[in-house]
């Protein structure tokens, strides 16, 4: 069964460059994942057709480039080269036979395979898309390709090898040199929720809570701030370019970088327009560093096993499948921004299918949105399609877009796009083995994903790091022990960036972030959205607290309080003499769609509200009905208007005619508080009257996270625990 989109039948159409809603949809062929790893070129081509240029073409080009390089000393013409190519190659092989195996011997082997590679180039491109993940056979092919480019023999690469030999490198301590007994001890502690916490404050009024497994050992010391890239264990290839784009770390960044590059989980609840690009560059640098170190470790171990064939080597350096990084994003345009960060940090000579990527993922901003808020334009600007997926594969010289998932290093996807791949339409076959070896998972703009369908996020994380159903040609002798023991989810690093934290995001932090290295939560200290109201006159803002015994009963308790304490006064103010309707201009803001349906049905059927005329706008309301409801409300034909938070998130309407605001619940996004209250001032002539009507909001103790953002951190405690009254007013 196809997963629900999460926006329902809303009229908020995506504006993708080609109008598509992701691969395999609207007449396209369904995506399929191959169960083999390294296929012969005569195998059936992928039905996905995602790979574009073939691997064979690149290899053949590299062969030609290498032969040209070796033959550069000859001044003979082309015909003479053709006549003497075999004797020359034979002579070259004899010359190289006595040389050091670390250098020319590799190139000799490359020349020996050149004719074979050229044959592969002749094959159909789609046949070559049936490549597999990072198995022994494919890495041998890659190794030959990399040898030609100098990955293992150049002096520059030799400098990089020092990073991998550094015992203090977090990559080594977290993934390679793992004490199995200590790992198991930490896992047992985590399974019983035996976390020990340390609290700290960061510059800029940020609160940090570090949790780590309490194994009874020495106290965990908070890492010192990182003041520059030189303090990080970066591959030289990245360090050479990162300094051009990532300046000296600011106070907040310097405090968080050690946790990110130290492979600890991070929940950052203070993402803003000003810091989003900085953190995006940081996590892109981190995942690139991880990919390069993983790849080079496998290549070097392959070289070692070839040099010592008689030795019984224990080389545990791989997972079950190739993909190591998963980045979850809300829109295609957000994916473009991440890819741009990756490409500026990883200088590739070639980018295969780059034009196709920008044609299908990027779009121009809507010029009619110039009056929209900045956060809206950042989220929905460009291509706002929320169903996509993209595989990226990295070689020494090339970034390959649209690589098959099982042949990719990084997977970028929206929750819906990933869910559509994991669950086939026929419901008969599920495929999520490509998520079995994810070692770094990133969720960016988590607050935006909440407004899509958070259940997709929960579904994806519940399928991360599971034992694969099929072997996919895996060489189990090279798989790390903690993969074989089913412990990968305790080693995986998860990074979540959000503008604010909700109960759903907290649940993800508690239930899916089990990193044995520890996890960190960062939240800001809030001054309160009530202080930033865009009106020229003061507005009375009243908060009414109702009692609720549990989160499960909260919807019923809220509805009971609304109908008994709030609705009665609304009906009186909206009814004139003789029971005739009187326009009151009351906007009823409802965060939850389920609550919206409940209130709407009650207003339509209850005898208590038989004289109350109202309109309703939700995320599922058609454009025509939205226009009609807004017109009737502005003209006074409707006394009240129901309005949901998700509607405001997707459309940011400016509702005119508002003289009073009732909030059935406070919004999750604190920005919405000022925007909704600001409706009172859209008609300058009635601003004073609207200010008298003011705002009334309902809340319970289960709304603590939302209320902190609205009223401020310092005021929250008294409002939740105050026993002297249940009503709080601010002007």
UniProtKB/Swiss-Prot annotation:
Q: Name one GO cellular component term.
A: nucleolus
List locations, semicolon-separated.
Nucleus, Nucleolus
Compositional bias (Polar residues) spans? 86-102
Residues of the region (Disordered) are: 1-174
Show the PANTHER family listed in the entry: ORF PROTEIN-RELATED, U3 SMALL NUCLEOLAR RNA-ASSOCIATED PROTEIN 25 HOMOLOG
What does this protein's UniProt record list under function? DEAD-box RNA helicase-like protein required for pre-18S rRNA processing, specifically at sites A0, A1, and A2.
Please identify the protein, giving its name as recorded: U3 small nucleolar RNA-associated protein 25
The organism named in the record is Blastomyces gilchristii (strain SLH14081)
Gene name, per UniProt, is UTP25
